[in-house]
């Protein structure tokens, strides 16, 4: 799992907790991104704080929803690209990154629709799935460790009619 940008030596439980925290941060930022996006207008047309341009506000909040929470995927995606392989992180970086970079262009360089909410909400669902996977792996690791602890340190084996401890 260290290829996902986690620090070497992190336990599975620590990695699961890290993914939970990243999921919660992404969710916290993705809610306003969704509500202020064109798609969120079905829930009401909210005025942006401080009279900010809507796309600029979405850029700022979406950056919070994507930068820190998605960092392990960006690190793993970079490593995969450097090694000329494709993996799950490559898919995540391409999908989230494409929506974010296109929206960044539409915010600052050309006229167009922004898709910050798509990139943010997609990352929220990816992080939720990754967190649940890490929790399951941590639980399985703990169960295997508990089973290994049940095994006695020494065993008696009969070889050539003699009892030998191994």
Listing of model-derived features with the role each one plays in the protein:
Residues 1, 50, 165-166:
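General structural signal for secondary-structure boundaries
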Residues 1-15:
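Histidine-centered metal-binding segments
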Residues 4-5, 55, 89, 162:
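Intrinsic disorder/low-complexity detector
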Residues 5, 9, 41-42, 133, ...:
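Intrinsic structural disorder/low-complexity segments
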Residues 13-154:
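Transmembrane helix-loop-helix hairpins at the membrane interface
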Residues 156-166:
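Cytosolic catalytic regions of P-type ion-transporting ATPases
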């Amino acid at each position: 799992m260290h290829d996902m940008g986690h620090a070497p030596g992190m336990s599975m439980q620590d990695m699961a907790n890290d993914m939970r925290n990243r999921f919660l941060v992404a969710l916290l930022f993705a809610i306003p991104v969704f509500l202020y996006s064109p798609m969120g207008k079905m829930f009401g047309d909210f005025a942006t704080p401080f009279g900010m341009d809507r796309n600029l506000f979405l850029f700022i909040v979406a950056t919070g929803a994507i930068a820190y929470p998605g960092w392990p995927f960006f690190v793993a995606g970079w490593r995969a690209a450097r090694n000329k392989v494709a993996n799950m992180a490559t898919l995540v970086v391409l999908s989230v990154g494409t929506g974010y970079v296109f929206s960044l262009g539409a915010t600052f360089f050309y006229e167009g629709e922004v898709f910050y909410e798509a990139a943010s909400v997609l990352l929220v669902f990816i992080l939720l799935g990754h967190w649940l996977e890490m929790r399951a792996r941590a639980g399985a690791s703990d169960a295997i460790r508990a089973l290994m602890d049940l095994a006695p340190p020494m065993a008696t084996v009969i070889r050539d009619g003699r009892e030998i401890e191994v």
